[in-house]
Amino acid sequence: MQHDDTIAAIATPLGQGGIGIIRISGPASLEVLRALFRPSSSRFGGFRPWTLHHGTITDGCDPLDDVLAVHMPGPRTFTGEDVSEIHCHGGSGVLAAVLEACVRHGARYAERGEFTRRAFLNGRMDLTQAEAVAEMIAAPSREGMRLAQAKLDGLLGQRVGALRARLDALRMQLCVAVDFPEEEVECLAPEAFLAEIEAVRQGVVELSAGYARTRCWQDGALVVLAGQVNAGKSSLMNALLGRRRAIVTDLPGTTRDFIEEPLNLSGLAIRLADTAGLRETGDIVEQEGVRMSRDLVAQADLVLLVTDATQGLQGPELELLRHAGPERVLVVFNKTDLLEGRILPSTPEGCRSVHVAAASGDGVESLVTAIRAAVLAATGAGEPEAGELAPNMRQAAALDKAATILDELAGDIRAHVPYDLCGVRLDGACAALMDVTGQSTPEAILDAIFASFCIGK
C-alpha cells in the first residue's frame, strides 16, 4: 500500500443525515479542494488554515452541493499530513458524487483505517492509540469510552514505554559486563538483577491482567437465554428489552433460530441472545436451531437457564448446568405467577437463581440487577477504576509473551547462564513490549489491525 499519495473517503456514517464529511489527506489535498471549491464570497482570498469557508463544490460546470470547506496544513493534523475536509449535506448520493469528484481530481479512494494508519506511520500516535480510535468508535458504554480514552491519551503506551526503558537499562549493563568483564558492575549482582527483572515482570503481568478485568466493558458480554421449550425464554427477552422482539406462542419450538439484541445494564453492555428450546426433535430446521443453541451456550459469558417454576429443573436443564458450570449460569425460575401457593423450586447447591414472571413483569427488575452482578462475577471483571488501563486481546497477548520471557530470563540468571545469552532473552522481552506500541510490529499484523477499521477513519 502506498503511503505518500493523497487519499479521500467519506468520514461520517453512511445513510441520510444533516451533515456528511469528505476527508482528504496527503500532499495534494489542497489542490484537490481548490479544483472543486467555488467560494460564495467575492472577498475570498484563498484558504486560511483551520478556517471554514462557505461555497459550492462543482465538478466541471456541474454544481454538486452547497458546502463548508476547511484546509489544515500538516504536520499538526490527525494524519500528520496536509488535510482538507468538505462538509456537505448528509445524503448518500451527495457524498458519493463529491467523493468521486475528489478522486477524478487527484485523490484515490482510501483503504480501511488508512487515515489512522498514516497517523501511526507519521508518528502522531503509537499503535495502542491507533487501536483506541476504533475502540472508541465501537465502545458499547460510557465505561468503555473512558477506557478507550485513556489509551487515546497515550497512557497505556507510556506505561509500556517506561517498562521497556527499564529493560533497556538492564540490556546496556549486560553489554558492559560482556564487553568489559574485568570491570565491576555492582548493579549486575545476581540479586539486584533478579529483583529488577521481577519488578518489571510484575508490572507487565499487572498490565496484561487489565484485559480480563475490563473485557466486558470494552467488548460487551454475551448473555444467552437457554432452556427447554416453552420455558418462557422469548417472553423473558421481550421483558428485558422492554419491547416485543421475539415471537411468543403456546406452541413448543416457536423459536428456531437465535435472536440477538444489545442491552445496556447500568453502563454494562451485553448482547442478549434468545435461543431455540433444548429438546430431541425430528424437525431438521429445529435440530439446527438446537445445535446453534448449544454452540452459543459454549461461547456465552453468562447463561440464563430459564425453567418453568411449576416444573423445576429437569434432566436436560441439569445436564446444561453441568456442562456450562455453575459459575457461568444464572438459573431463572419463570412463571412464578402460576405456582398458586406452591413452594418455590429449589436451586442446586452453588448455583445462583432468581424468580420472575415474565408475562406480568414481576421480578424483572431484580433479574436485571442479578444479570449485571453475575456477568461481572463470571468474567472476573469489576467496576472500572479511575486511571484503569485496558489492553485489548492483541496487546495482552504481547504482554503475556514479554512476561513469559522475563520469567525464563530469571531462571537463566539463577542457573548462571552467561550474560551474552541472557541478553538474547532480554532482547526478546523488549521486542514483545515494542509489539504492543507498534515499534516492531510486522506489516502483515498492521494490515490485519487496520483492516478492522471503517473506511474514512
From Swiss-Prot:
Organism of origin: Nitratidesulfovibrio vulgaris (strain ATCC 29579 / DSM 644 / CCUG 34227 / NCIMB 8303 / VKM B-1760 / Hildenborough)
Intracellular or extracellular location(s): Cytoplasm
Gene Ontology MF term list: GTP binding; GTPase activity; metal ion binding
Binding site for GTP: 230-235, 249-255, 274-277
Family statement drawn from the similarity comment of this UniProt entry: Belongs to the TRAFAC class TrmE-Era-EngA-EngB-Septin-like GTPase superfamily. TrmE GTPase family.
HAMAP family membership: GTPase_MnmE (MF_00379)
EC number, as in UniProt: 3.6.-.-
InterPro entries (UniProt xref): G_TrmE (IPR031168), GTP-bd (IPR006073), GTP-bd_TrmE_N (IPR018948), GTPase_MnmE (IPR004520), MnmE_dom2 (IPR027368), MnmE_helical (IPR025867), P-loop_NTPase (IPR027417), Small_GTP-bd (IPR005225)
A Pfam family hit: MnmE_helical
Binding-site list for Mg(2+): 234, 255
Reported cofactor(s): K(+)
Name of the gene encoding the protein in the UniProt record: mnmE
Cellular component annotations (GO), alphabetically ordered: cytosol
Annotated positions binding (6S)-5-formyl-5,6,7,8-tetrahydrofolate: 23, 85, 124, 457
Main EC class the enzyme belongs to: hydrolase
Function summary: Exhibits a very high intrinsic GTPase hydrolysis rate. Involved in the addition of a carboxymethylaminomethyl (cmnm) group at the wobble position (U34) of certain tRNAs, forming tRNA-cmnm(5)s(2)U34.
GO terms under biological process: tRNA methylation; tRNA wobble uridine modification
Quaternary structure, from the entry: Homodimer. Heterotetramer of two MnmE and two MnmG subunits.
Cofactor binding mode and count: Binds 1 potassium ion per subunit.
Annotated TrmE-type G domain residues: 220-376
Organismal lineage: Bacteria, Pseudomonadati, Thermodesulfobacteriota, Desulfovibrionia, Desulfovibrionales
Positions with a binding annotation for K(+): 230, 249, 251, 254
Coiled-coil ranges per UniProt: none
Protein name: tRNA modification GTPase MnmE
Protein keywords: Cytoplasm, GTP-binding, Hydrolase, Magnesium, Metal-binding, Nucleotide-binding, Potassium, tRNA processing
